[in-house]
Amino acid sequence: MRLAQPDMVSAAPTEVDRLVWPLADGADKSPLGVLSTTEPLLRLQRTQRVWEVPELDAQYAKAFLELWPLGSFLVIGHEPGQVLMLKAGPSSGDINTYQIQRFPGGVSLESSNLCMPDCPHLLAFLSASRDVLPRTLLLPTPTVGAGDNHSDPHRLGCIQVDTSGRVLSVVNQLYLETHGGWGTETPQQTEPETGQKYSLAPRKPTPHRVSWVEDPLRPEAHHTGQEVHHPGADAHSLGSEVHFSCPALEEEEVNNDCYKDEDEEGCEDMLTAHIRALARTRSSYVARQYRCLRARLISDSGNPYSPGDPATELLQDVRQLLTDLQNYLAKDPDVRAVFGNRGPSILREEDLGPAVEVALCRAVLEPLKPALWTKLRTLRAQELRRLRRRQIALRVGAGPEGQSPALRNRNRIHARLAHLHAACAPRRKVALLLAVCSDVYAGLGGGENKEPLGADAFLPALTEELIWSPHIGETQLDVEFLMELLDPGELRGEAGYYLTTWFGALYHIAHYQPDTGRAPQGLSSEARASLRQWHRRRTLHQQAQPTAQANQPFEEPWAIGDP
């Protein structure tokens, strides 16, 4: 069996084409995505003046990086001429330089399709996903206990706990070597045991970019490969020592856990009960909208005002109803009063919208979910049958499933896919989808000494997992559900980044050619056009550059005749 590879040559993206991380809730509210933890971001934020040395010359930066482990990096220069310098290989010439570009939506590497709010967010992502880099970034060293003696001259920064265990202090060794130690003596360099010092816990590699989704392609500099590292909580300093209270760090990490299950969040229970009561009160606006959607789901006719794909129209109607109800309820005084009585948790105005969304999914969408999925299965019946037939054909060509060494990881992935389908709220589905991506990357890692792989390996790996999935039809509907129901702000960044990857993997399976034994060598022109159209229609770029195509319905490539 031969699976298609994504195009490795990609255009330098325009500002409109970039997948931008949502900024509405601030940096501390960014979704965790495939990182599964806030540790990399927290470490980078607290050690920013360790790895960011604007006054350092490129020649000196290269000399330092040559002494450090693979994946070590520095950000040098002043805006707008900042560059990322990365040690990509063992030889002295393997120091790569990447221009950091700044846009109204954040920062991005040159030739990359992904934009993040700031440098720490971008580097945190690049510590797990190489994107256009040849390897992932190796983050600064983790916290060490009181009394630990580290004399390694290759250490990027030193973070220590005082004898009371209550304060962290950071000393930037790079700064001391460059500017002198203010009365401190630089220890004599000894031969480091880099293999032992930097035997860091392996991290799940993630892909570079889904370049085959983007607009017309142009050549790009070929940067590949990576290594991964997940750090602990740190602090930041340039030469002086900066102190942080350890308990505050722990609270921040706990509060940034974005992967909590819906059932674990009990603070919205009163709000859910209130909205459920409104849905049962026949005269209320919520009840009228609920009845309209229920009638739409059991009706045999489509939307007379939008003569496009029926399944896409249905999901657009669901999204429109949920958006209208969320806006209506967020302004309702009774809802705001219930929200204000949630308990001892800290209330913030920006938390009201997400709380109403979760409550709406529980009180309105969840009761209608069986009817919604029955309707979607009916509308997609022909396409789902073809997808299942192609899946069976690919299984035959792949051989017995038991031959796979990653069977345990595969069972975990299939269990997550089942939970993904059982979930109702779009945000919960996205969290589970990204968790599946992490599991796929874990299977790609293979071992501590194995070089992590990028998107060229991730797409076939994801496709293979879907070939053996017992839930592939439900997964197809879940992906389409998320592509239509997620807010535009949530579709920027990792959510849109990976949804298009899943779209591509499912497309490869659905269009597998049993006669030739090959998957399609890339997406068809129809699929590419659909994705570009979807991207313009469903992201906030539509507001920045409205086009005639932006208002057209998203025509899936399902209508292609079954060969």
From Swiss-Prot:
InterPro entries: SH2_dom_sf, VPS9, Vps9-like, VPS9_dom_sf. Its main location: other. One of its GO terms (cellular component) is actin cytoskeleton. Keywords: Cell projection, Cytoplasmic vesicle, Endocytosis, GTPase activation, Protein transport, Transport. Residues 184-196, 542-553 have a biased composition (Low complexity). Signal peptide: none annotated. Guanine nucleotide exchange factor (GEF) for RAB5A and RAB22A that activates RAB5A and RAB22A by exchanging bound GDP for free GTP. Plays a role in endocytosis via its role in activating Rab family members. This is Ras and Rab interactor-like protein. The gene is Rinl.
